Amino acid sequence: MNAATAAVARICTKRTPQPADFLVNIGTCAKVSYSKGSGQTCRNVSEKETAAGDGLHSSDKRKTVQEQSVKAGEVYLCKKIMEHVTGRTFYPDILYRHPFEEAEIVTGAMLYHTENKTELIPKYETAIKNSVADGFLYDMEASSIYQAGAYFFGPHQMSFLKVVTDEGNVQELSAEMLKQGIAGAVPGIRSYLDELRKIDGIKKLQNKKAMGEVSELAQKLN
């Protein structure tokens, strides 16, 4: 979490973001599944971050990506971020059309462990009802990135895209399995980023035009 905060702060202090800019967090997450009405409890979380803060977020027993009940490669746009340690909640504004399902995500400081499975369900019961149909997402960076980004961006300038890679079996995942799971999500994410670039270009033109009109008006007044 600290690494994510430091990365955002470093980038944004080296180049001050402009009103037309966007902060987009693209990362992986675990999907905490829960069958409503079945009395089933969900797996809880604890994790060990690896390579470049990429965020592998959960830990469970003996399943490959192909054997999981969740579908690896699903992409979600986060509409609500809940910080597990502090209980704080953050709401990125989703103003533009997109092709993704929207979900609520919990950001924790540790890996997802089955031993703690009774903790998350009661605490995030509302998230279970309002987020993905059978659970919610879990990562280790979204809330930190939001809080660091809030110094430079408005809520409408921040987007959080999460690709599901596991449901709690991160110890059994290899780099190749993760690569395969994420590969299918790339085209949709690329299209979304292209749309944001178009919006960014339009905003810059509008700002430039507005500045020109202000300058012209100032000259007339003088």
How would you name each of these model-derived features?
Residues M1-S38, K61-N222:
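Glycine-rich phosphate- or other oxyanion-binding loops that anchor nucleotides, phosphorylated ligands
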